Amino acid sequence: MGLTIAQKIIKEHLVSGEMIPGEEIALKIDQTLTQDATGTMAYLEFETMGVPRVKTELSVAYIDHNTLQSGFENADDHRFIQSMAKKYGLYFSRPGNGICHQVHLERFGKPGKTLIGSDSHTPTGGGIGMLAMGAGGLDVAVAMGGGAYYITMPKMYKVNLTGKLQDFVTAKDVSLEILRILSVKGGVGAIIEWGGEGVKTLSVPERATITNMGTELGATTSIFPSDEITRAFLEAQGRGEDYIELKSDDDAAYDRVIDINLSELKPLIACPHSPDNVVTVESLKGTKVDQVCIGSCTNSSLYDMLKAAALLKGKTVAPSVSLSVSPGSKQVLSMLADCGALTDIIASGARLLECACGPCIGMGFSPNSGGVSLRTFNRNFEGRSGTADGQVYLVSPETAVAAALTGEITDPRLLGEMPQVKMPDKFKIDDSAVIPPADAETAKTLEILRGPNIKPFPDSIPQGDTLRAELVLKVGDNITTDHIMPAGAKILPYRSNIPYLSRFCFGVCDETFPERAKAAGQSIIVGGNNYGQGSSREHAALVPLYLGVRAVVAKSFARIHAANLINAGIMPLTFKNPDDYDSLSQSDMLSIKNVYEGMDSGNLVLTDEKTGKDIQLVCSFTDRQKAILKAGGLLKYVGQGGGL
């Protein structure tokens, strides 16, 4: 039987395990990336391991999240990360150089390579045929130290594309269509491979938009073939030597095949507050709009920006709308300036923001109270924009421009003729904002720069054979890592200070949680389906760990968050009968006996001491995961000789 594209890369990088869906496999990692909101903790963890130099082919530290620098905290963290990069062998992308995924696609990504990043949208690299996955910072630290990356061997889904996108219908609409079909949990446990004749009609930036938003499906990653379109992109970036052809075998087998005719798609929009709440744009026509944002790692390429600029040229943003534009990289911004497109954007009345994540993570440009904001981003979770009651819709750049010009949700096909955008044969190459590391000898003499906001990694406790703890919080379905550990301008500066950060844990759900959890000493959280979806931020595990959470019992878990819980020494356990969720109440005292035996058998019994009811739980921990939990987390496991 033939192999899929992903299976070929996995086979080439397989360290241990068998390529059977559901089995644990270990992969050699070629490249890593971090961003500053998760990077500080990842480098503290790496430093603790005592490895003198990163052992990957390439590791890059990006600064793209905490760029406001309204106090000393962000600037200190950036100095810390830069000093770590210089000493330990990483490249450092300076603030203003761009969003990690956009810059990595332009300057570093290579077809056929493995990449993990401490950001959930790392699968952007699948647009050029990388096996690129989001991971927790500790997993990234282990990979930098030469350790393997462990995942459950995924199933293989194929999306077969036919036809060609019509004018004003975009790759973003393809992303929203697959979300409409599969939902935010429909890709869990799978790799989404994109194929068919329609693939040949999509540029690398369009492909990267699609793989970027594959994260919202809960998929392990998404990937496109590496073909002549990939070659042309790499050659235009001056990296033609990085090209290799990658395609699936004709007899490759897939667990599910989905057909999408690109020619039949219409402009789509995701309504508040979930990326899979998808309807047609025309069905919402006339809805008043307060704000429009164009940018993010999903839609900030030169291709997207040129299209937006062409539609804005000679026009003026509606008086009732505030429009922001955030180019994805310094390369994009510079080329917009050179060709005059930047002038067209500014002349329309748009506000030009820094080449960074910005509004996508609530880092400025929050909408007004109850405001309707159309964004070319990938997530519209409640409160993520920085405005608790903000109504955020996800759209393509074309739909965003249509709303900015008319002041209401408008089908972009009503704008008239679509201006033709031609991509350059050569991109403008200037890597001066990427600082290389010191040589190994010089590095030995370098000092790490630490500010007072950087606090140690929280200590974890080895999992004992009996757990007795209060149920301190009960939450529902699709709880995101934004719910667990919010972001935004007020909170992100403290990502390297877990004690202070803990004050905001679950603040969206229950402001009393931090104090109640600390008072309980040790505790259990109960959740519904798809617990921990969204961002890869390990802080959503580290902060509960700091507050004494010992286990999370849910109907189901998102992949990255479940791994982060285990890495922190917290047990993710699943209801055998999901209906048992209803029988538990917040503040009940719960107990689990014979934990080690239950880990081995995959079956545990949780007793509600208030009602006397026994509830069956299940788990599927590998031997390695059991050892991590018994050690008190991955960092302690590595310290005891495991993992590297």
Residue locations for each model-derived region?
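Fe-S-dependent hydro-lyases/dehydratases of central metabolism
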Residues: 1-644
